[in-house]
Amino acid sequence: MNLIKMSDIDLSGKRVLIREDLNVPIKDGMITSDQRLQAALPTIKSALDSGAAVIVLSHLGRPEEGKYEKKFSLEPVADYLRENLEYPVRFVKDYLTGVDVNPGELVVCENVRFNPGEKGNDEALAKKLASLCDVFVMDAFGTAHRAQASTYGVAQYAPVAVAGPLLIRELEALNQVLKAPKKPIVAIVGGAKVSSKLSLLKQLVGMVDVLIPGGGIANTFLKAQGFEIGISLYEPDLLDEARHILILAKEKGCQIPLPTDVVVGKTFSETCPAFNKSLSNVAADDMILDIGPETIRDYVDLIHEANTIIWNGPVGVFEFPQFAYGTRAIAIAIAESDAFSIAGGGDTLAAVDLYDLNQQISYISTGGGAFLECLEGKTLPAVAILQERAKHVKTN
C-alpha cells in the first residue's frame, strides 16, 4: 500500500488531528459497547506518548446536519477516554476557529456532523479543520468510504496527511482476504436485504468457494427457487437478481447452500413461540426467523472445512433468544476454526460481542459500509486521498 503511516512521522511537539470512528451506541448517556473505542485507544495513546498535542474528531449517530442534539454529543466518549488514558482530556464544543492544546494533552471535539457542510465535503469547513493541525491522521476505517469534510477534505488541505495504525491494520486484514486468501474460502452474508448487498454478493461468487446467505437475503433466494416462505421478509423485486446470482455462482464454481430447515414464528416478537420446520412444511402464515438444526450442522461443517472465512451479517433474528441459535452456532464455528477469519458490520460485531468471541476471530473490522465496499473491490475515497498525498510527504 502506497501510504505514509503515522509511525513514519516525528510527532513530537506537533498538533496532531486524528479522525477516529468513535460512533458507539449510547443509551441514557451510557456507552453500551466500547469496541470502537478500544480499537481507537492505541492510536491516540501512541500519538500522546510521542509528545504530540492531540485533537480527535469523530461523528456519532445521524443528527440533522448543523443542528446540536444532546443525544448525539461526544461528551460521554470524552469521559470514557479520560478514564482510560493517563493524560489530561478536554472536551470542546467550539473548535472551528482554533483549539488550544499542549503536547501530552488530548482534546476531543464535538460531533463533526453538527457542522454544516460535513457530509457534503464543504471546502471551507475542510480548510478550517485542516488549519487545526500540523499533521492529519486518518484512522477511521469505518468512515473511509465517505468523502466528507472530516475524512477526505481535511486530508486534502492539512500540511501532512497520513494513515493511522488502525486504518493500516484494517486494510492489511482485508488485503489478506482479497489478494492472497487461502482456499477454500467461505463467506457468510446475512442481513435483511439483498439490495443492500447486491454488489457484494456478485463480487463474492467470483471469489469464494462457498457463499452462505442468511436472514432476509436467504429468504429472497428461497423464494426465487420457488419455495414457500410464508410472510417472511424478502424482496419481490429482486427475485430475478437472486436467480441470476445463483446461475453466476454455478458458472464460477461457487456453492450457495440454502436452508433445508428453518425456525419460524407467527409474529416478529421476543415472546413469539419458535417452531422448527423443514422447508417443505413452511405454512402461508409462517415467518422464517432463523435456520434450523439440520441447516446449522451443514453450515458448521462447511465452515470447519474453510481456510479463509468472511462474515458479514447474522443468519437469524439473534436479538430474540429463541431465534438466535443459528447465528450463535455460526459465530462459535468461526471462532473455533483455525482459518483466517474476518468479521465486519454492526450486527455482526454485536453478535461477536454478545457471545464474547472478540478474541477468537482473527480480525474484527470496525467498518460497516467501508468493510463492504472493500470486499466489493471498490477504492475508498479517504484512502485514495491519503495515497495521493503520500506522493508528496517527506517523513522526518
UniProtKB/Swiss-Prot annotation:
GO terms for biological process: gluconeogenesis; glycolytic process. GO terms for molecular function: ADP binding; ATP binding; phosphoglycerate kinase activity. Gene3D superfamilies: Phosphoglycerate kinase, N-terminal domain. Keywords: ATP-binding, Cytoplasm, Glycolysis, Kinase, Nucleotide-binding, Transferase. Monomer. This is Phosphoglycerate kinase. Its main location: cytoplasm. Belongs to the phosphoglycerate kinase family. PANTHER family: PHOSPHOGLYCERATE KINASE, PHOSPHOGLYCERATE KINASE 1, CHLOROPLASTIC-RELATED. Pathway: Carbohydrate degradation; glycolysis; pyruvate from D-glyceraldehyde 3-phosphate: step 2/5. The keyword Nucleotide-binding applies. GO terms for cellular component: cytosol. InterPro entries: Phosphoglycerate_kinase, Phosphoglycerate_kinase_CS, Phosphoglycerate_kinase_N, Phosphoglycerate_kinase_sf. ATP binds at residues 197, 319, 345-348. Pfam families: PGK.
